[in-house]
Amino acid sequence: MTTRRTGRAEKTLRETTAMPTADHRAAPGITLACALEEWAGEDARRRDVAATLNALAAGTIQIARAIAEGPLAGDLARTLSSGEAGEGQKALDIISNDMVIDALRKAPVAAVASEENDAPVLLDPEAPLLVAIDPLDGSSNIDTDISVGTIFAVFPHQDGTDAASVTAFLQNGRDMLAGGYVIYGPHTALMLTVGAGTWHFALDRDGSFRLVNAAVRVKEDAAEFAINMSNYHHWDDPIRAYVDDCLAGRKGPREREFNMRWVASMVADAHRIFQRGGIYLYPGDGRKGYTHGRLRLLYEAFPVAFLMEQAQGSAIDGRSSILDLSATGVHQRVPFIFGSRDEVARAARYHLEPSGHGERSPLFARRGLFI
């Protein structure tokens, strides 16, 4: 039986994996299992994390195969019910949830907190780890054949907590032991961090994830932003001002042209940012139920923020680092801004310096393209 370890041992693990090191730079082309084995060595906790990540990978490979069948497997986009997180559940949402939870039954995981379940699903109450997961991000895109994904975070199961309770999952972002996502697109890719940099894997024809890059870096600056413009009239002034200044192009305070992107699948937007930089914004707004945005802290914002920081990017809630937050609920929502470090810092200044909207000159301080 796997023994749960907490306290100083966990803190030491986080300290020793906080930054990328040459020892963890696995060779391109090796499998995920081999890369994790090299990283874990003889450390018992790391081996538990590695086993859990391998199980997650196995579950996502099943999901990839189901997605590849498309309409041949039936109407995967049909809405079956209203999910516990407050959104309609598609058939593929439920299929994906079952696949990853079944895969994790073979791993040292005490419980799983999923977007598709109200309460955590208990697996092995004595196991040392917890998993928080969005089994299928972007499921509104299923019937249009646009990229969707699976997002996950691995946390320690702290001593004295009931794995079946919500309380066990109410941890700080810095407590995360691993985070990542799988994107199902033209090819299936895995972005993963265990605190030793951000690793990029691609799924080969034989069903193995193989390493593409063990040192992913997000460009510090890029003239591309992703936001749902249809919500413009619901946003607070700092977000409107930031977007207005981007859209003003060379004639505005930014003095450069910007492109806008929006896929309605966070993993797709995140994957583009890892490849070529940019910024993603899903702020809170004035709509009922959207004061704190739409994205979930525990199983969406936390893992993507971990990946971003490990790739020299940044992730904030508008003012503070996402990873400095502590969850207060399994399905807690949070405003989420992430991407190129310099651009995220600039967006933060629009919140922190509202009177001048960051670096705006007086000419633009009270001007907007739509007001």
From Swiss-Prot:
Mg(2+) 2 binds at D134, D137, E300. Keywords: Carbohydrate metabolism, Cytoplasm, Hydrolase, Magnesium, Metal-binding. Mg(2+) 1 binds at E115, D134, L136. One of its GO terms (biological process) is sucrose biosynthetic process. Substrate binds at D137, G138, S139, S140, N228, Y280, L281, Y282. Pathway: Carbohydrate biosynthesis; gluconeogenesis. Its cofactor is Mg(2+). GO terms for cellular component: cytosol. Its EC number is 3.1.3.11. Binds 2 magnesium ions per subunit. Coiled coil: none annotated. One of its GO terms (molecular function) is fructose 1,6-bisphosphate 1-phosphatase activity. It comes from the Bacteria. It is found in: Cytoplasm. The keyword Magnesium applies. Pfam families: FBPase, FBPase_C. Belongs to the FBPase class 1 family. Homotetramer. This is Fructose-1,6-bisphosphatase class 1 1. It comes from Xanthobacter autotrophicus (strain ATCC BAA-1158 / Py2). The gene is fbp1.
